[in-house]
């Protein structure tokens, strides 16, 4: 038995029915069967009162545990008033609770409970917006009723979301179950959305009632009478147990289509149920079109399982080679992935993530994979999508609801196993409408997506047969749980030679066809094409190159149509300034000569690799280090490490750093720069400054340094070496741990560069300044140093 004297989680249950009680509300309860003693005990602060909803109104019958719902609210009594039939009490709702056990006695019901407070998943701003929206809809409803001004004054005075919902629920025609559903919903956001849904249904219902009443008063509306008669006929048939009449020709057509769709049994059952609803509706009713559209979606979706077809790897390789020049490592990865699918005889879809700069062929690779697999190809552009409903669809209760884009794409493909490209997945955005990236977790999880449930479809759909290919420019903005579900394939920027072959063998012919030209009318010479690539584009891919070729094609088209040129119209290198204007490329070039303190570093940007000049100079001052060029925190720390390492390792006692300022600048000051890979370049620039030894202007370097003088590996080596080769660099220092990454670098680039691996700053200074550092044990013994001199590097 429960001891009511135990004040921990024990309370007295007051049964209530057909009302909504939410925390923070004030309400009046009637107690027609309570004795005076029982009424007085309601105000006892030592007893917890719990208002607990009944599942239905049981009248005089004795209540049992199963008659109650499990979620209720505690309340305090503010005032009690005697009435003709009993008592009424003004109460304030305190907390939401969940009942664990009951103890039902002759004159009281007690229960053990635990608190289940609301989940506040709305910001104050969102709550205020939801309150204002509810008031707005209520105003629109009240305009149809005379004398509603007093009611609206009470509504406008409500500021709390729970209080407003509880107050309005007394005037709404919603079922007891729907009222209890509001209380049972713990999320404040979900409760508000459900209430708005009920309110909008109420609005539409009242609107229809007023319209029908008006039409019926003016004239016995045929459609209205038909609706009433249909409902009456349906009720009579159910009462007489006659069932439905024989199906019409239209219904037989739907039955045949449902059979032909080869749905799973549970889906077929849903479709037949919807068909039954459709038969009972008037074609002119709003519900008729909602049911019809849903039924059409069920029928048109592909349900039939596809047999796994053998993959012709040679044909797949041929298609990839034919449609994409270069990218050998990427194509190898794709072919290997297809080979694994073939060996496993795996019908389940795969999930690849192609990551790389814009214009390198990520989306078109997905199309080629679809062709290689002989599957349908569909593409979803997800850039800027911020509504979860775009992925999961809208619930059918909303006006204008539709399925999510995943289900729409499957319907468009007409097959259950298409290749689906999710483009720009890194540009999904979260908002108050939900997080689309989180919605994609179910779509891209092989353990879950065989029962993916779209909100509109509302039945499980098997996505496990779909071959998903996502594309992104960067991994940084992709949530980690989503990234874990995909196999990442990096696509690097193209080399100059690759761009030339792509332009010559693919882009020129494609652009000519788009502009109605052929190779007998327009010819772009090789030298001109090379110059377009080097001076009129600044990109990792070839999208800008295609635009420049298209510009030339448009100019040529105008000249050819006007008979202003002889055919073929040849574009030479010297013609480019007249056709394309001033060159737009701003790639830095290696300098012819350097001064002490200037070093060439290497950077990796979204459009490929670049060289980066680092300049250092000294002056009289107070020992400060000045850093300019819009450097990030990591790069500033690299400069501090370089200076500390310089002071500790070089024999420079002749320089008093307390009386000298050092200024380090990285040109292109409007461009933000960050990262640790400029460490050895910063160190070398400072060493060059204090020793007065120049660094070869054709030498560039990249690598992170530590206070121990170690050179650590960096990222983006391929792009950096491509940028060095393009800028005219002939010698590059890289970290020793990055030597393995040279396998990713095209052979043509490696042949034009002398690449030297370095492991410590001693190696760096030996290659750049031709000096060696003293042994590390001499660092704190300046007497061992020869002031102002350096030991030449050993051969």
From Swiss-Prot:
Its main location: cytoplasm. Transmembrane segments: none annotated. Residues 11-203 form the Lon N-terminal domain. Keywords: ATP-binding, Cytoplasm, Hydrolase, Nucleotide-binding, Protease, Serine protease, Stress response. The keyword Magnesium does not apply. It catalyses: Hydrolysis of proteins in presence of ATP. Its EC number is 3.4.21.53. It is found in: Cytoplasm. The active site is at 677, 720. CDD domains: RecA-like_Lon. Induction: By heat shock. It is an enzyme of class 3 (hydrolase). GO terms for molecular function: ATP binding; ATP hydrolysis activity; ATP-dependent peptidase activity; sequence-specific DNA binding; serine-type endopeptidase activity. One of its GO terms (biological process) is protein quality control for misfolded or incompletely synthesized proteins. ATP binds at residues 356-363. The keyword Cell inner membrane does not apply. Homohexamer. Organized in a ring with a central cavity. ATP-dependent serine protease that mediates the selective degradation of mutant and abnormal proteins as well as certain short-lived regulatory proteins. Required for cellular homeostasis and for survival from DNA damage and developmental changes induced by stress. Degrades polypeptides processively to yield small peptide fragments that are 5 to 10 amino acids long. Binds to DNA in a double-stranded, site-specific manner. This is Lon protease. The lineage of its organism: Bacteria, Bacillati, Bacillota, Clostridia, Eubacteriales. The gene is lon.
